[in-house]
Amino acid sequence: MKSRNGPLRVGIGGPVGSGKTALTEKLCKAMRDNYSVAVVTNDIYTTEDAEALVRMQALPSDRIVGVETGGCPHTAIREDATINLQAIAGLNQRIPDLDVVFIESGGDNLAATFSPDLADITIYVISVCQGEEIPRKGGPGITRSDLLVINKKDLAPYVGADLEVMDRDATRMRASRPFVFSDMKRGDGVSSIVSFLREQGGL
């Protein structure tokens, strides 16, 4: 699909340690054989996430760009997305046939949102390790993202999180918006997320 911005732009946000980079890796590996894919990662002072994706062999290195946002990471995806838009423009110039660009935000809080000028579809990632109460705490990431991913479901028994409670709270907080439980270590939930992107993104 070519959106009004060119390739479909998928924003991936969430707190530090929720599994954003693991999700980005799994999506790249699941989609790269059928689509032309690239990634822009955001870190405050380094390009660590971009380097990690290269090490994971998610994509060739020329399809992964890391940007250093400085300051608050949410600014670079919402108030002033210039640095990300420039990175995407560079990818488009280098790889004209791009179908999808994943934009991975730096670790942020529950109030983080993507500018509509930057992302066509938004995915927000939380972890059961942050506590079963996270879905009911709300915030734009929980309530307004196009897809909520509740990651690390395999660790629920070890951190005292009740998945049924999280399911109930996510259903209530998100109304009709979809969410999925995942375990990125084993790849559980990835196929559902890819299907969502195909359907909602017109891929």
Swiss-Prot record:
Coiled coil: none annotated. GO terms for molecular function: GTP binding; GTPase activity; nickel cation binding. Keywords: Chaperone, Cytoplasm, GTP-binding, Nickel insertion, Nucleotide-binding. GTP binds at G14, P15, V16, G17, S18, G19, K20, T21. Pfam families: cobW. The keyword Nucleotide-binding applies. It is found in: Cytoplasm. InterPro entries: CobW/HypB/UreG_nucleotide-bd, P-loop_NTPase, UreG. One of its GO terms (cellular component) is cytoplasm. GO terms for biological process: urea catabolic process. The keyword Chaperone applies. Its main location: cytoplasm. Homodimer. UreD, UreF and UreG form a complex that acts as a GTP-hydrolysis-dependent molecular chaperone, activating the urease apoprotein by helping to assemble the nickel containing metallocenter of UreC. The UreE protein probably delivers the nickel. Facilitates the functional incorporation of the urease nickel metallocenter. This process requires GTP hydrolysis, probably effectuated by UreG. HAMAP family: UreG (MF_01389). Belongs to the SIMIBI class G3E GTPase family. UreG subfamily. This is Urease accessory protein UreG.
